[in-house]
């Protein structure tokens, strides 16, 4: 009887390497596949693609599996990077890793793996898949400190039915132990951080290669000009560092934070104090939705939600549709609202709002707007909250 073939996405890191080894030990016919998703800067100081490939080959030789490289750079630029730039240009803060998983790692990669006669694919993500009554559920990892279901919430039934996450039941510390015990050449390699195509380079420097600077006023809620920004695309909601007001002693003397953007007037609004009302939200509206089960939860469903990675689940109530002026959007586009029990800090348009029912990831959507702690205010795409005197 032939062994079941599993194609493993190998990045050169410890997690995907241990994933391949575990599956080989379990008797699967394992094939490693290295994805190259970015063409530029291959010889630059910030690009590790060449070394990553060397590490993949070394690991494959050690554990005794075949490995090949596949180039998805064109698909990545078309499906992920173009959207990344569009979102930043519109003043939002996107999460390209979420889109990369849905469009590249579990679509282009999955399609290629099937062409290699694979029955399943596997990655080193920390998450779990469970089949129940013919449906597939996406679950949090056993090690909640490493859980990556937030980034995987756009996966659908077809993708999950073909996916394995061997590390979902294993603590990260155990993964490191396994790597050392079997002598993996990359056992002590640091975990990768940041957006894959940016690497370790300064984010603002990278973004400036693709988006022009467009200076404008930096104002407080009462309309006072306190500085000049270099372009709204270069700032994100809740940002503290890099604003350029560190030495300013005006106002309360507390740290400054980015609180809103007004695209029409090219104005960046800043406030002082971590818990300023403009940084706190009890409600949000999200669009571009995706549900793991293929359908949304029931209207009024009480659940938990994350509005950023590694955030604790925040208790909230799900609404099938937003109400009021914020409900306006592209015709036919599904949207939802969340009403939180407690105010959430720096809910950022462009990021993902991901819903959970305990351990089960239900799916989510892209945050479009978030009502702040003051009546009549909202942080949304292209609009600043109402000025203080208008409250």
Swiss-Prot record:
Q: What is its EC number?
A: 2.8.1.13
Claim: Isomerase is one of the keywords in the record: no
Biological processes, Gene Ontology terms:
tRNA wobble position uridine thiolation
Task: State the reactions this protein catalyses.
Answer: S-sulfanyl-L-cysteinyl-[protein] + uridine(34) in tRNA + AH2 + ATP = 2-thiouridine(34) in tRNA + L-cysteinyl-[protein] + A + AMP + diphosphate + H(+)
Keywords linked to the UniProt accession: ATP-binding, Cytoplasm, Disulfide bond, Nucleotide-binding, RNA-binding, Transferase, tRNA processing, tRNA-binding
Tell me yes or no: is Transmembrane helix among this UniProt entry's keywords.
no
Question: Which NCBIfam families would you find in this protein's record?
Answer: PRK00143.1, trmU
What Gene Ontology cellular component terms go with this record? cytoplasm
A Pfam family matched by this chain, by name?
tRNA_Me_trans_C
Identify the stretch(es) annotated as Disordered.
372-391
Comp. bias (Polar residues): 372-382
Spell out the disulfide connections: 100-196
State where ATP binds: 9-16, 35, 124
Q: What is this protein called?
A: tRNA-specific 2-thiouridylase MnmA
Cited function: Catalyzes the 2-thiolation of uridine at the wobble position (U34) of tRNA, leading to the formation of s(2)U34.
Which parts of the sequence are annotated with region: Interaction with target base in tRNA?
Answer: 95-97
Instruction: Please state where this protein is localized.
Output: Cytoplasm
User: Which family does the UniProt entry place this protein in?
Assistant: Belongs to the MnmA/TRMU family.
> Which species does this protein come from?
Burkholderia cenocepacia (strain ATCC BAA-245 / DSM 16553 / LMG 16656 / NCTC 13227 / J2315 / CF5610)
Example of a GO MF term = ATP binding
Residues of the active site are 100, 196
Q: Where is this region: Interaction with tRNA?
A: 146-148, 308-309
């Amino acid at each position: 009887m032939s062994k079941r073939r599993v194609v493993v996405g190998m990045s050169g890191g410890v997690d995907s390497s241990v994933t391949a080894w575990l599956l080989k030990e379990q008797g699967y016919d394992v094939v490693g596949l290295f994805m190259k998703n970015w063409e530029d800067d291959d010889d630059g100081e910030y690009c590790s693609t060449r070394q990553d490939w060397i590490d993949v080959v070394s690991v494959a030789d050690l554990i005794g599996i075949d490995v090949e490289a596949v180039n998805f750079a064109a698909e990545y630029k078309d499906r992920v990077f173009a959207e990344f730039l569009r979102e930043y240009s519109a003043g939002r803060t996107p999460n390209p890793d979420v889109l990369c998983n849905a469009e590249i790692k579990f679509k282009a990669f999955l399609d290629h793996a099937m062409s290699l006669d694979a029955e399943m694919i596997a990655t080193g993500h920390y998450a779990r898949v469970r089949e129940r009554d013919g449906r597939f559920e996406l679950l949090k990892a056993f090690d909640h400190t490493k859980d990556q279901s937030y980034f995987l919430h756009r996966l659908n039934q077809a993708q999950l039915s073909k996916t394995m996450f061997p590390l979902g039941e294993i603590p990260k510390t155990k993964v490191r132990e396994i790597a050392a015990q079997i002598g993996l050449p990359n056992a002590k390699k640091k975990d990768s951080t940041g957006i894959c195509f940016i690497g370790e380079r300064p984010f603002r420097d990278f973004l400036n290669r693709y988006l022009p600077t467009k200076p404008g006023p930096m104002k407080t809620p009462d309309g006072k000009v306190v500085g000049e920004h270099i372009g709204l695309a270069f700032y994100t909601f809740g940002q503290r560092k890099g604003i350029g007001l560190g030495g300013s002693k005006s106002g309360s003397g507390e740290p400054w934070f980015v609180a809103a953007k007004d695209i029409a007037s090219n104005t960046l609004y800043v406030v002082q104090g971590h818990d300023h009302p403009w940084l706190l939200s009890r409600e949000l509206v999200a669009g571009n939705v995706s549900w793991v089960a293929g359908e949304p939860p029931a209207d009024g469903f009480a659940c938990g939600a994350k509005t950023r990675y590694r955030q604790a689940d925040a208790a909230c109530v799900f609404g099938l549709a937003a109400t009021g002026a914020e409900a306006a959007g592209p015709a036919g586009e599904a949207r939802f609202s969340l009403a939180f029990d407690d105010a959430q800090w720096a809910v950022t348009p462009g990021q993902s709002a991901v819903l959970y029912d305990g351990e089960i990831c239900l799916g989510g959507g892209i945050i479009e707007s978030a009502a702040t702690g003051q009546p009549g205010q909202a942080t949304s795409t292209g609009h600043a909250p109402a000025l203080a005197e208008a409250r």
